[in-house]
Amino acid sequence: MDLPVGPGAAGPSNVPAFLTKLWTLVSDPDTDALICWSPSGNSFHVLDQGQFAKEVLPKYFKHSNMASFVRQLNMYGFRKVVHIEQGGLVKPERDDTEFQHPCFLRGQEQLLENIKRKVTSVSTLRSEDIKIRQDSVTKLLTDVQLMKGKQESMDSKLLAMKHENEALWREVASLRQKHAQQQKVVNKLIQFLISLVQSNRILGVKRKIPLMLNDGGPAHPMPKYGRQYSLEHIHGPGPYPAPSPAYSGSSLYSPDAVTSSGPIISDITELAPGSPVASSGGSVDERPLSSSPLVRVKEEPPSPPQSPRAEGASPGRPSSMVETPLSPTTLIDSILRESEPTPVASTTPLVDTGGRPPSPLPASAPEKCLSVACLDKTELSDHLDAMDSNLDNLQTMLTSHGFSVDTSTLLDLFSPSVTVPDMSLPDLDSSLASIQELLSPQEPPRPLEAEKSSPDSGKQLVHYTAQPLLLLDPGSVDVGSSDLPVLFELGEGSYFSEGDDYSDDPTISLLTGSEPPKAKDPTVS
């Protein structure tokens, strides 16, 4: 800010008014007590700043502020000279401030033109600053836009992951439910298969090629059952009480009946050729039977009447009711088939009392047979093959990956309420009643002589069916029961005595197990 020039001031016109006023003020001898040149003439001194500000500054400038005067000096390039004594901690006694400029010299007023005011390029600085700031703002906006795009991308990815997570959780829940249902189905299948295995274990299932009794051919192995029951009779009194009155008319299964031999009936599934059996009797008894395969059963010839065993037989019981060893399954199955009234003749085989092997019979005699219904080998084999094929197909379907199961149908099919033990089996009381009916006498007993003289002796019919029956466990049967006195005591003793010689008869040797073992046929499974 230029001040008006004081009195006595003169200078070129291009010199700033502040410099002109300063030159006049320093050169005025009236103000030497407050401001004057230095002895060298290169600078000037301000002796008392307070008094100078009050008395001198208002005369030349429009203010009395010492700080403003110093700021103007600095704007024109004047610098404050600092002495050594002024740089200490102790305040100097004299208030003296010295300012100097290279072009402000005593006696050289023309140099004032060289003193220029410092021009501050405010506009340039502002434009550069604004440019820098604009670049920074642009870069910042670019970064913000990039960050915003990344944030939107992350939001979209997060939303997609959220949807995928929800879908995965729904799939996991569905898979868990399907897994639980499949576990239930598998458990039902396992229970069903276990029940089948248990039922097959209880049933007396035979091999594919069981034995048929033949006359003179090579002996076959005995039929194999799930449980082996001995067919030997017990000599002497048994552990069971006396039979009920329903058994009084027959000596079959009587504990005190003494016999050594008799016809043996065994069910077979294949008819093997054998030599015909001749007998001195008449023709074969032709009675109506169901359409079933026939099985040949060897019949012993009548023995001479002077046998001591025949004479020692009980006179109260006819010889036609002599005990005959039968298979328990054959007997019970044949009884259960008797739901319809069918004429069944009582078995009246003759007893071989000679204690010797039977004499050879003439080959020209007519063949005598007993008709027994039995399963055919091919039917049984086809049935077993079909069961194996069904089990293999079931296993293949369960192990395949693309197999879908209707759980509702399977759960209804394999419910625990439908098991093998729930099958409708014949009641024990009705079975026992049928046994008593069968064992009751069908006709009045005839004397021994009339039985021997009858031409139809030894031609009785036995009705048999191959229906499977669940056998009872001998250990679970009460020993004191008198309903079935012989079914579970067959294995306690030998049917034939040790003194009898039946080594030549293959049929009796098969029942006693005295025949030497033979080489196993490789075709027999």
From Swiss-Prot:
The modification Phosphothreonine is found at residues 142, 324. SMART domains: HSF. It is found in: Nucleus; Cytoplasm; Nucleus, Nucleoplasm; Cytoplasm, Perinuclear region. Phosphorylated. Phosphorylated in unstressed cells; this phosphorylation is constitutive and implicated in the repression of HSF1 transcriptional activity. Phosphorylated on Ser-121 by MAPKAPK2; this phosphorylation promotes interaction with HSP90 proteins and inhibits HSF1 homotrimerization, DNA-binding and transactivation activities. Phosphorylation on Ser-303 by GSK3B/GSK3-beta and on Ser-307 by MAPK3 within the regulatory domain is involved in the repression of HSF1 transcriptional activity and occurs in a RAF1-dependent manner. Residues 221-310 are annotated as: Regulatory domain. InterPro entries: HSF_DNA-bd, Vert_HSTF_C, WH-like_DNA-bd_sf, WH_DNA-bd_sf. This is Heat shock factor protein 1. It comes from Bos taurus.
